[in-house]
Amino acid sequence: NGEIYNYQELRKELIEAGHVFVSNTDSETLIHGYEQWGEKLVDRLRGMYAFVIWDTKKKRLFGARDIFGIKPFYYAQMNQTFLFASEIKAFMEHPKFDKIFNEDALGNYLSFQFVPTNETFFKGVFCLQPGHYFIYEDGKMEISRYFEPNFTGKYEKTFDEAAAEVEKVMKESVEKHKISDVEVASYLSSGVDSSYLTYLGQVDHTFTVGFDEGEYSEIQDAKDFAESIHMKNDAKVITPDEYWDSLSDIQYYMDEPVADPAAVALYFLSKEAAKKVKVVLSGEGSDELFGGYNIYCEPLEHTAFNKIPMPI
């Protein structure tokens, strides 16, 4: 599941090494890459992916997930059976799967509004963490981390230099993400993140949703921005009835509880976009990278408690 954005470069390197391809797909590139480099293949990949390869020679299963965890990967070992899927609901169809509620995940969810470990709300079902790969052999699963961000803590560039570097990286990344056989569109709100990506992407089509309350709708701002850069904008207003009626469907698709009310808007946004396109750019992730939420300030606010005297 996913897309390998640098597969053409890898394919060229593998052909030079003697590999013979029968297609021009990133999936086949993964197979030849594993044959050439083994587990080290993941160090060369750029993209969003979750995949497995059955090694017929070594009789083992190799699988990996991208460094940001964009593509999901779930697994379970129960009743002498190893299960894996992109969605937890897929396990429900298997006769060896035991559907048992995981109370430990509930405690984490109520404390942090998400589950910070690899556990899920189903006992025995785990998610492969971002930037990890696994080898399943002789009934045993060994998981390894292949990517870890490196923050030195030293940064001596000026604000303007940093901004220029971010822009350079963003432009290059968006260009990679636009490699597609079909039209690429963009989600658009009035926020800086989606507006910036939309501008960089130079797409023809944008999609926006808003609520049936003026103060909670960004439709007009999004339309004005799209018009200013000569892009088409499709907008949908979500009514209160549509909001409440959609919750059961959203929960079904999410598999687990999600403490983000924006999931409703994203559901309708995706539903509208899917009527016309298959690929969209999204501003998801910018707040996490640049500390855009108040919750990221909480550790600093609580530092004063470190100085409270210990009891005698």
List where the protein language model places each region.
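Cysteine-centered catalytic environments shared across enzyme families
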Residues: N1-M254, L266, S270
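Active-site adenylate/phosphate-handling loop in enzymes that bind or generate adenylated species
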Residues: I67, F268-I312
